[in-house]
Amino acid sequence: MAREENVYMAKLAEQAERYEEMVSFMEKVSTSLGTSEELTVEERNLLSVAYKNVIGARRASWRIISSIEQKEESRGNEDHVKCIQEYRSKIESELSNICDGILKLLDSCLIPSASAGDSKVFYLKMKGDYHRYLAEFKTGAERKEAAESTLSAYKAAQDIANAELAPTHPIRLGLALNFSVFYYEILNSPDRACNLAKQAFDEAIAELDTLGEESYKDSTLIMQLLRDNLTLWTSDMQDDGADEIKETKTDNEQQ
């Protein structure tokens, strides 16, 4: 199947909300690239949307099951807890496979072939995101390894973003948003999370008048999410996370 046809099929799968198939079509596009070829902005966004939906459904399932597990444990329902743990393991296996799939794709072809600054940041941010999703449910040495890989990818992305992308660039802002969520949720460092989010927000505000019309909506939306998280984190550091922490859903369509 030609590249254009796979892209069209991916769009069709998105409309039908068949995201596993959308992933498959975009993987075919990604692996068929020549050594000097890159995904277009549209193609990389389609890949991101596909994986975000596939992983998002499992992340939501895992959170619900984990919450039920805690309740059953507190009630002393050991039989129920055993059933829940087995079911949670099944979801975790799916999460691992999805993350492994995109991380292999990023390391084998997408990151090495990226030439423009925004492409490099986009893919390194994506690498950080999927290691972070692993860190959300892994434990012990595996969690530590996932967290270290997340930090390494986000820092590499941040270095390029600070050097090559404007403070108002939606990809740079999206990176700051997700990096700050990593500090808060995975490393339990609310101070670092707040500092990173505030710096990104302040730097973008200072250059808001230079923002082009095409990315104005995306950039201001992520800035709002940064501010929402800052408000949440600073108002009550003791909050148990009852309110939803905001992170980027896709890079061209913040939700």
Swiss-Prot record:
Similarity section: Belongs to the 14-3-3 family.
Protein name: 14-3-3-like protein B
Gene Ontology BP term (one): protein localization
InterPro entries named in the record: 14-3-3, 14-3-3_CS, 14-3-3_dom_sf, 14-3-3_domain
UniProt organism field: Nicotiana tabacum (Common tobacco)
GO CC terms of this entry: cytoplasm
PROSITE patterns found in the cross-reference section: 1433_1, 1433_2
